[in-house]
């Protein structure tokens, strides 16, 4: 799906249903008008960002059948909602099927998702698999079960995608999830690894996409409240929270408040990698590197804190002094 087309589609779709007072009702107050305006801005921003991500990474193509994985959380609800809006005006044809994995967690409200999906008119499939009992049997009480649960869920969803004939699997990870994963891998895994917007699945049979890759979590929280999605709690399994990921989430929230733009810069850095200025010998041929005699615009000069002084400035206090280069012929 080409980015320009998707952006046009996003612009066309970006009108919130209830942004104005319905006919026959009293005119909106100034406060209500302001809220409606802000809500419409939020919707337009999310739709634009989803459309841009889809276009940038060619996530959805003509004839695709997109399996939208719906957990009952705010992120997957928002992803489905926006994809449905975009599909209405997309320049290509693609199908959407919503899939939920009922893992038989105690207290899981089985009726919520089917009722919602019937209401919005989306084809859906509920996969019933008691992974909860497996996880409880294998993971000691009080430990985090998320990792094992995730692996089991992933394998089941890959199988279901094949059975349904889905060509793309859409997950609801957002910008904050991606940055959190980057930090977790750096701090605890010793590697530069994030969460890509598009990838081939572990089994090599599926393409996984993340249409919300450019969207902030705070925007999704506001959007879920605005759209009144029937949210299903994510702690029904009784698992202890992933403390390391919770730590990264709190760190990102704090940075967003105290240092606006910092998290965005970190996120943008994932798409602007300079292998010659890292240390991975598999990405850059350091061992065979030789001087070419030609200036490199991405060389070390890009990291100078300030330009070297010249002319009259050279003698100023604190100014950089010229360096004498001595030839050592006997070395």
Swiss-Prot record:
Q: What assembly does the database describe for this protein?
A: Homodimer.
Gene that encodes it: ttcA
One GO MF term attached to the UniProt entry: ATP binding
Q: Where is the protein localized?
A: Cytoplasm
- Function text: Catalyzes the ATP-dependent 2-thiolation of cytidine in position 32 of tRNA, to form 2-thiocytidine (s(2)C32). The sulfur atoms are provided by the cysteine/cysteine desulfurase (IscS) system.
Alphabetical GO CC annotations of the entry are: cytoplasm
Q: In which pathway does it act?
A: tRNA modification
* Protein name as annotated: tRNA-cytidine(32) 2-sulfurtransferase
Give additional notes from the record: The thiolation reaction likely consists of two steps: a first activation step by ATP to form an adenylated intermediate of the target base of tRNA, and a second nucleophilic substitution step of the sulfur (S) atom supplied by the hydrosulfide attached to the Fe-S cluster.
Family classification: Belongs to the TtcA family.
Major subcellular site: cytoplasm
Organism, as annotated: Burkholderia orbicola (strain MC0-3)
Pfam families the record matches:
ATP_bind_3
UniProt-listed Enzyme Commission number(s)? 2.8.1.-
């Amino acid at each position: 799906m080409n980015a320009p087309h998707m952006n046009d589609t996003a612009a066309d779709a970006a009108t919130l249903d209830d942004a104005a007072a319905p006919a026959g009702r009293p005119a909106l107050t100034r406060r209500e008008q302001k809220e409606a305006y802000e809500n419409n801005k939020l919707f337009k921003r999310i739709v634009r960002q989803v459309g841009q991500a889809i276009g940038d990474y060619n996530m959805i193509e003509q004839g695709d059948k997109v399996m939208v994985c719906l957990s009952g959380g705010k992120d997957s609800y928002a992803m489905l909602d926006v994809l449905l809006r975009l599909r209405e005006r997309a320049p290509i044809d693609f199908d959407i099927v919503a899939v939920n994995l009922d893992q038989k967690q105690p207290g899981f409200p089985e009726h919520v998702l089917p009722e919602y999906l019937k209401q919005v008119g989306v084809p859906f499939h509920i996969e019933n698999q008691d992974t909860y009992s497996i996880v409880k049997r294998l993971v000691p009480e009080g430990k985090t079960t998320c990792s094992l649960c995730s692996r089991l869920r992933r394998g089941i969803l890959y199988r279901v995608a094949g059975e349904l004939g889905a060509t793309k699997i859409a997950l609801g990870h957002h910008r904050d999830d991606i940055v959190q994963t980057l930090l977790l891998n750096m701090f605890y895994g010793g590697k530069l690894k994030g969460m890509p917007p598009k990838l081939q699945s572990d089994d090599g049979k599926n393409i996984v996409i993340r249409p919300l890759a450019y969207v902030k979590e705070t925007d999704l929280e506001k959007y879920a409240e605005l759209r009144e999605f029937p949210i299903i709690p994510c702690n029904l399994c009784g698992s202890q929270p992933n403390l390391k990921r919770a730590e990264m989430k709190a760190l990102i929230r704090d940075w967003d408040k105290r240092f606006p733009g910092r998290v965005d810069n970190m996120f943008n850095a994932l798409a602007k990698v300079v292998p010659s200025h890292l240390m991975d010998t598999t990405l850059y041929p350091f061992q065979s590197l030789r001087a070419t005699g030609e200036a490199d615009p991405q060389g070390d000069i890009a990291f100078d804190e300030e330009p070297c002084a010249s002319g009259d400035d050279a003698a100023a206090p604190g100014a950089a002094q010229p360096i004498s280069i001595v030839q050592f012929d006997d070395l």
